């Protein structure tokens, strides 16, 4: 019977594990919903900010505007902002974005450019520190749902790097949220800022829904049609000063959106990983139950044979 006991113990262990993975899946799903609500809540501000920036840019298009955040310099050094997670159990989320950042660093090195990392997330920080890569700053322990305060703190560090000319360009490496089962590490330039194209900026809002007992994502593309400011609008301050003050806010807003996308990607990856783990646990329980029943039947048959054999020996 020890074989039966070991199988029974293993079945119970797998059942307990399945309870944990199922709970983690539901928690991740709830947090994806919160991330979705945050994206929707911050969108009106982002829309209005883009419209004001476009209006100011249109008003100043014939003037010689020299703003540090818009000035493109000869690139000798690049800052790489990498957004990863603090925890594992989320499939290939962390591995994919770290590999993308590492490959980009190798490309810059081949081009003869210096680089330094600004890291968000414990996983990327541990990876690059073990490999003794240059890290200017790191941020760990951020909220599961990113906040504007966190985005502002990171943006201040990036502004310091760029304005001090320690780096001539800052690139963002993050994971773009596509669906619950798909995400894509992408790279975009954060600094110097480029406000071109704000007159028709396409954006997407994702909504977590259920269908047939399964979670799925609905995506809606929204177009922001920015309009020039009224010609008779009078500014108390110089429009150049207003634009200069709004550009850091625009940077923080771009960064917040990247943090939101990365958080949604991580949560979706964790939800998918835990769902797969729960399914695999269910299949393993079925297989172990079948093995247990076969072993139990074999044990009963053996006992019957022993009883019959003993009875025959007595006759």
Curated annotation (Swiss-Prot):
In terms of domain of life, where is this protein from?
Answer: Bacteria
Q: Which SUPFAM superfamilies match?
A: ATP synthase (F1-ATPase), gamma subunit
Q: Name one GO cellular component term.
A: plasma membrane-derived thylakoid membrane
Q: Which UniProt keywords apply?
A: ATP synthesis, CF(1), Hydrogen ion transport, Ion transport, Membrane, Thylakoid, Transport
- Matching Gene3D superfamilies: 3.40.1380.10, ATP synthase, gamma subunit, helix hairpin domain
Compartment(s) of residence: Cellular thylakoid membrane
Membrane topology is:
Peripheral membrane protein
Under CDD domains, the record lists:
F1-ATPase_gamma (cd12151)
So what does this one do?
Answer: Produces ATP from ADP in the presence of a proton gradient across the membrane. The gamma chain is believed to be important in regulating ATPase activity and the flow of protons through the CF(0) complex.
Q: Which family does it belong to?
A: Belongs to the ATPase gamma chain family.
| Self-association state and partner proteins as the record states | F-type ATPases have 2 components, CF(1) - the catalytic core - and CF(0) - the membrane proton channel. CF(1) has five subunits: alpha(3), beta(3), gamma(1), delta(1), epsilon(1). CF(0) has three main subunits: a, b and c.
- Protein name according to UniProt: ATP synthase gamma chain
Please report the organism this UniProt entry assigns to the protein.
Trichormus variabilis (strain ATCC 29413 / PCC 7937) (Anabaena variabilis)
- Give the classification, highest ranks: Bacteria, Bacillati, Cyanobacteriota, Cyanophyceae, Nostocales
Whichever gene encodes this chain, its name is: atpG
